[in-house]
Amino acid sequence: MTQFASPVLHSLLDTDAYKLHMQQAVFHHYYDVHVAAEFRCRGDDLLGIYADAIREQVQAMQHLRLQDDEYQWLSALPFFKADYLNWLREFRFNPEQVTVSNDNGKLDIRLSGPWREVILWEVPLLAVISEMVHRYRSPQADVAQALDTLESKLADFSALTAGLDMSRFHLMDFGTRRRFSREVQETIVKRLQQESWFVGTSNYDLARRLSLTPMGTQAHEWFQAHQQISPDLANSQRAALAAWLEEYPDQLGIALTDCITMDAFLRDFGVEFASRYQGLRHDSGDPVEWGEKAIAHYEKLGIDPQSKTLVFSDNLDLRKAVELYRHFSSRVQLSFGIGTRLTCDIPQVKPLNIVIKLVECNGKPVAKLSDSPGKTICHDKAFVRALRKAFDLPHIKKAS
């Protein structure tokens, strides 16, 4: 499998913005915390045959480093501090933190090491897996097909939104981790730049090179790790929210709500948090039900929902985004993050439903109990029970 051994990645910044945002917070607050994370394919794809090719790419990643022009660009952003950027300048991926194997046809990947280092593996490694698999499976697919598909979808989008006030519609590219290829993502983003409602990308490399706004705050792992960092499990979500505000008191203020279900999140999201955070991000469960709960929560706290932003990012496409926009646009500010349906939308190409999620922090289990049962991840059933009890959650959902 060495015919495709040329490196997929060419920049340390070819990752999602929230990875660097979280890494800085970990660097400042949890420098000595260790974690473990594991790969999951949520579909029925047997990806183990690609293990050797992926292992080669993991080895190649150790040569990535922050370039001088990238360092200068990050330095000009308002939320990065000099001590972190100077450390990042010396950062190199350590392939010894990653084990890749073929487990009876299934791709098995485990990451372990200091959280401040391991945190950067997830997004570029998923992008590598996606691109390597598609190179083998769909060698005939190309950028032109992706662009043709997008043009067709944009024509449908224009017809769908004719006569609709789109001044409050904001779309972001969230497509790095499951893209068909780096080239396809860049081509799609360049085309979307022509649309007035396109506001940015989660990819720091593309944001820098295309003069776009980088988008993203924090991910599930921020909340998961606090399940073991916090001395009180029931307080762990509030501890995560508070620690984020310590690092970013006036910016990057969109909170992810579904690490332990939306209902449990809202019980922790009191008036101080709700006032200080700019808004909330949806990533599982029914989006309309979620949005209604969020708006009702703000109103109950005496906060005008119009002053807050709801970000929808779960399995979206342009049509779903318009439906949500029609439903909510008069009541709250909105943004939509679309990933796979932008960057891996090519005829006869099956996108991968793949993730890498935290499973341990300081040698102890952590869990994600989202609003979609199929997204629940944890090895330790006793810990899942303890987590459900601590957060007063109802009926049991199967952990996977």
Curated annotation (Swiss-Prot):
What gene name does this entry carry?
A: pncB
Phosphohistidine carried by residues: 220
Q: How is it modified after translation?
A: Transiently phosphorylated on a His residue during the reaction cycle. Phosphorylation strongly increases the affinity for substrates and increases the rate of nicotinate D-ribonucleotide production. Dephosphorylation regenerates the low-affinity form of the enzyme, leading to product release.
First-tier enzyme category under EC: ligase
Full protein name:
Nicotinate phosphoribosyltransferase
On the tree of life, the source organism's domain of life is Bacteria
Q: What is this enzyme's catalytic activity, as reactions?
A: nicotinate + 5-phospho-alpha-D-ribose 1-diphosphate + ATP + H2O = nicotinate beta-D-ribonucleotide + ADP + phosphate + diphosphate
**Entry similarity comment:** Belongs to the NAPRTase family.
Its Enzyme Commission number? 6.3.4.21
One CC-aspect GO term:
cytosol
Q: Which GO terms describe its biological process?
A: NAD biosynthetic process via the salvage pathway
Q: Which CDD domains match?
A: PncB_like (cd01401)
Role description: Catalyzes the synthesis of beta-nicotinate D-ribonucleotide from nicotinate and 5-phospho-D-ribose 1-phosphate at the expense of ATP.
- Give the organism's phylogenetic lineage: Bacteria, Pseudomonadati, Pseudomonadota, Gammaproteobacteria, Enterobacterales
Q: Which UniProt keywords apply?
A: Ligase, Phosphoprotein, Pyridine nucleotide biosynthesis
The annotated pathway is: Cofactor biosynthesis; NAD(+) biosynthesis; nicotinate D-ribonucleotide from nicotinate: step 1/1
Query: GO: which molecular function terms?
Result: nicotinate phosphoribosyltransferase activity
